[in-house]
Amino acid sequence: MELSRRVFSALAGTTVLGLALGGSVSGGAVPASGASGPVPTGPPPAPPGADGVRHRVAFDRHSLLVDGRRLVLWAGELHPFRLPSPSLWRDVLQKMRAYGFNAVVVPVAWNQHSPAPGRYDFSGVRDLDLFLRTAAETGLYVVLRPGPYIGADVDAGGLPGWLTTAEGDARSTDPAFLRHADEWLTHVDAIAARHQYTRGTGTVLLYRLDAPRRDLLSHLHEKVRADGVDVPLLHGDTPVAWGEAHGTADAAEARRVHLTHLAHGVTLHDAGTVFGGTSWGWLAAPSAPTPTYDPAAALDEARRPTDGIAPLHQTGHLLRHVPDFARLDPAPAVPADDARIQVRHLTNPDTGAHVYVLRNDSAADVTARLPLDGTDVPVTVPAGDARLLTAGLDLGGGRKLAYATVQPMLTLSAGRLDIAVFVGRTGEMAHVVLDCPDEPWPTRLDEEAAWAYDEDRLHVTVPLGAGGLTRVRVRSGGSDRTLLLLFADDAVSLRLWPYETPSGKGLVYGPALLRGAVLDGDTVRLTGDMVDAYGLEVWTPRGITGVTWNGRAVATSVSRARSLRSRRPLPGVTQPSLPSLDGWRRRDENPEADPGHDDSGWTVADRRTSHSTTPVPAEQPVLFADDYGFHYGDVWYRGRLTGAAGLESVSLAYSTGARGMLMAWLDGEPLGTHDAGQGDDGKGTWTGTAGFRVPQRLRERLRDQASEGRPHSPVLSVLVRRTQHDQDDYRRARGLTSVAFRGVSPEVHWRVRGAAAPDPVRGPLNTGGLYGERNGWHLPGYDDGGWESVSFPRADRRQGVTWYRTTFRLDVPPDVDASVGLTLDDDPDRDYRVQVFLNGWNMGEHVNGGPGARRTLVLPNGVLRTRAAANTLALAVLSGGGTPAGPGAVRLTLLGSAAGGVPVTPVASPGRGTP
């Protein structure tokens, strides 16, 4: 079975990967690759790091085997190229680790690193080596995806723009393409090889190849191995539907999806996009054209948890802390007494533990009875949801779970205490039953709990969510260790954070996030985030008597639950204030529409052939922007017409990605605009023909000039917002494709101009071909002293581009992580677009009133200076003149804040004339 972009595969039964872990293996039963014999259920390997020790990675039909221990991989996808602030990579990776992930899937976009053939850049926001070091320091395995084609809703699927005009068919074994692809992999693999977990120099555990054809796959396999990559190789090329959310912000749907995968024996999980980030610059693909990428991700663009994160958090820690899930076999069917509940039964052959996944695809909540360990147990599964139940789990100290109606989240031993956490939905009654051959001594530590002992079983019931975390202590009952049962609903579970140290495990309750726990003598030093004021409770390894939080000592006392509990709540975050945006300056541009504009330095458009899949019209030159080296953003055309007297109308055919558009002028006179539209989600290219009548006064002028013997050669100026390349058919043309005239057929000599040379810091996808971009109007330090002073809102009517600039300062305290956005409020009937530049970085396009338009664009810290430094904000407003054009109200918005965070280094943002 091949790996997909959403789910790797089930390493279960006799199913293996098309390109197997460690090498090419055909389907059928496969012995453990590199395993010396059967590997029993046991503790997972320690969290990974660059420890300098060689590691062995193998697999059998159940799971990966790392140094002889079973590993269930719980991975989420993060696109470093969608977060242009390397300091924040650590923030997101730490959050992934805290929320239960043990691996990160990392696509590497070729187009971010290669502005031209033979040129590669892995510096700054493209520093792959830094990202891999950070992942290792965070304790996460890495699944590396360097493509060459990655999809990922990136322009051309990650292929560089210059490849659109190169010989050779991409994603094939065409030798011309393979020369470029091999060169790309040579550069990536040199970095990857330095970070392989097998060598102890990093945490790259798996390397994924993306290829639609077996011959290409074979070539890539040989190439990667020749480059010194020796970790297991995976293969996957099945995309989700374009436009489909890759994650899900709905907790019920997330539970249903991921528990279904678990029920089918999956032990290599790709939970989808954990952090979507920003499609800044011209990074986006037609399938996801808005700056905000994957709003259904577990962490939103502002790095805040979404509603869908609770089941990921619970399942991730379950798979980490309950080793039974690393070796599950299908077991005899155990049907519920209501057919609307589908039940999948699995068992661990080593421990005898049973796992039941109940799924309800109906539109109504369903309560059914399920036979668990000889007892018919009533279980409710909400509509469109799923539930995981277990029986026979080892809870430590020789205690066994008979059954439970709620899901275990984790089991661990902290000092002399065994801890088991059970989670469920708010308002439901949790019922946990323990086998106790001797009468136990249970103690309610919170009043919500109730218990009863009957027929050698202890029954504990708790209404979830009634009073926060509910604690029940159990002594005796056939064990010489104390068991602490903890009960939480989804919200409370997100305040529970297990941690691991060389001296043992522990658990923290209370903070919004736990980033780290380090033992220092008799003290545990905790770091993390607080949002609201809340108490802190810590279960520790033996010998720990003190606690610090973010470097400050916390006064604690020992609770009846054997925890160190803070004597007073930890303080929440102090909300920072944001300045108003004023002091705006304005300037119109598009001198390219002026017939007298000097275009002698522009590229002559006179080619007659192209590698594009778009046909070149007969008897017309190639006008496709890519063929002249302009691969991203806006492109200008100027056609000088000879014999234009009698011209009645002009028809301009053009091709763009999603939300493309065109506007035209003839001899400086506006002809109008044309919008290619949004179209269907699955569409990768939009084509349109803009028909414009020549204004009567211009027709008369051209006619009079011709009749007076002084024929004039008018200039047809066209601006095309060509937007994204198709992910699949990446060679489809962008820009003008053909031109037709009515009345006469003038001779036309075309010149074309797009983006200037790529920004060496911000990269090739940052800017397009607007006059202001080419001349640095978006950059810090540009002298706008001669521009007009204005205030918002604006109501201008003109066809073309208008720029606005201002500066502002933030003063966020150093111990506060504040996420800030730029909000543009206006009447949706006003038709215009805004490119937002922050300190020279193109943060994306706001289409006022457009489909899916988001009024708030996230400004990532690092690009945004938050510590008393100046920020330059530039807005490039593109309007057609048919309606008043804004901006309306423009303001900074606080999207979220926390006391804590990570240190943020400002991202290099050179200004006008800065080296």
Regions found by a protein language model. Give the residues of each.
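Non-catalytic C-terminal accessory domains or segments of carbohydrate-active enzymes
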Residues: 49, 309-872, 876-915
